[in-house]
Amino acid sequence: MQETFIELVPRSASSLCEEMRQVEQMDISFQGYNLPELKRQKSSFLSPEHMMQMRKKAELSPEKKLALHLRTQERNVVENIERVRLMAMHGVDIALLVTGDAFDPGEEPATCAHNVLDGITVPMGGIEIAVGADLYMKQWGRWGHKIPAIQKGIVGSTFTQPIFHPQTLASLHENIGNFLPEKVYAGITWISNAKSREYWHRKNNVPAEFLPSGESDETIRYNSISQSADILRLVRQQGFSQYVMLMSGRLEELQQIFSLSENIREH
């Protein structure tokens, strides 16, 4: 069954709860939330442990599914596995293991996500384990190391980098089978300005021709919203689940993308 998740930025407990309240008042059908573990040198965000406690207290929309990211690189394998078990005890549905970006670009992560998977010998009860798929790296980065855990049924799903172009979506179909877990959540987001567009191209290796065109920020945003609506429609037509990343976008733009995707589908 297809599912739609909404990814929100957990800046604070109050802002997260308020955004959830606003999203649930919109005319959008979705099944869950995807909340990242973020670390920035000049910003603070809620930790997964804080969000677990909020979930246990029913402060995080108990009627919706919840996927939480776990950055693996700052902890050893045993500590990461214990965090997954803790998630299961606090009502989290999906543990998304991601290595995470290092503060120092030249720093090698101490523990990659696949190292944690190697330490899990059987599927864990009470929680689904997911991994990220970096669609813009050669051979999807370290993806080959994750395949054994997929084949053993330890990994149940993957959340992809945002898809900006149908050509990227086609690559998912080429790798269905032993290469991908049963459920794929295709990432979707939109770009608000030229600086953000440059970030996706330079930092995340998205081909420039896949990104929205435009000279002004207003034109880039308009084109990106339309492009994201097209991708959302295609993802649904092709049977993938999806998660839509709010990031720095506005809630009314999120509503617009869903509305446009429905309108396009009708024609």
Predicted regions and their residues:
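Active-site glycine-rich loop that binds ribose-phosphate moieties when present
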Residues: 138-153, 168
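Glycine-rich anion/phosphate-binding loops
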Residues: 72-86
